[in-house]
A protein has these predicted regions:
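Asp-based, Mg2+/Mn2+-dependent phosphohydrolase catalytic module
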Residues: 3, 63, 67-84, 92-123, ...
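Acidic active-site catalytic centers that drive phospho-/nucleotidyl reactions
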Residues: 8-10, 51, 126, 130
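Active-site neighborhood of HAD-like aspartate-dependent phosphohydrolases
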Residues: 1-47
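Residues that scaffold the ATP/ADP-binding catalytic core of kinase and kinase-like folds
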Residues: 16, 58, 178
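A short alpha-helix capping/helix-coil boundary motif
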Residues: 12-16, 51-53, 85-88, 108-111
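Substrate-recognition element of Asp-dependent hydrolases with the DxDx(T/V) motif
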Residues: 32, 36-69, 82-95, 134
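Gly/Ser/Thr-rich helix-start
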Residues: 12, 55, 59, 126, ...
Length: 183
């Protein structure tokens, strides 16, 4: 079985531009390639799980999303980094699907397809829904404060959360180093 780090996309590995509608608008956050490369070098599968309701809303198509993900993979490859898989939910939040985070269907699909042991894996994201999904899966969870909708302005406010993360990091590189130190 493999261990994995499940990463949110917008606000965690890429700048959150409120519905990234074109590949030209996609921008990796600083040090993300280093973080992803570090995880892979330490034996982790790196899997992106992202909610993309802009498809259901008609803001962009699945073809456009594929172009955005191609750009992401290309930019990572320029730094000798790569993700092992990308899974996305195209549904509107009101549809009630099981694949939209904090739902766990995409995580289970990835775990099955990549022989991932969820108990030895991590979920990293910038929103409480990422933490909730990780907790439901039995993964360790890390909140990064790089997203504009991050639920905290300081780590202390998470103490009262019903499902606080296992760790709060300022960015993905710090999160990756914490994961490696604690795995």
């Amino acid at each position: 079985m493999n261990k994995a780090v499940f990463l949110d996309r917008d606000g965690t590995i890429a700048r959150d531009v409120h519905y990234c509608r074109r590949a030209e608008d996609f921008e990796l956050l600083p040090a993300v390639p280093d973080a992803i490369r570090l995880l892979a070098q330490n034996g982790f599968k790196v899997v992106v799980i992202t909610n993309q309701s802009g498809i259901a809303r008609g803001y962009f198509t699945e073809e456009t999303l594929a172009q955005i993900h191609d750009k992401m993979r290309s930019e990572l490859a320029q730094h000798d980094a790569r993700v092992d898989a990308i899974y996305y939910c195209p549904h509107h939040p009101d549809e009630g699907c099981s694949c939209r985070k904090p739902g766990t269907a995409l995580f289970y699909k990835a775990a099955g397809e990549h022989r991932i042991d969820l108990q030895s894996s991590y979920v990293v994201g910038d929103m409480q829904m990422d933490i909730d999904a990780g907790k439901a899966l039995g993964c360790k969870t890390l909140l990064v404060t790089t997203g504009p909708q991050s639920p905290i302005s300081s780590p202390r406010s998470l103490v009262s959360s019903p499902e606080p993360p296992d760790h709060v990091a300022p960015d993905l590189l710090h999160a990756s180093k914490w994961i490696i130190d604690h795995s």
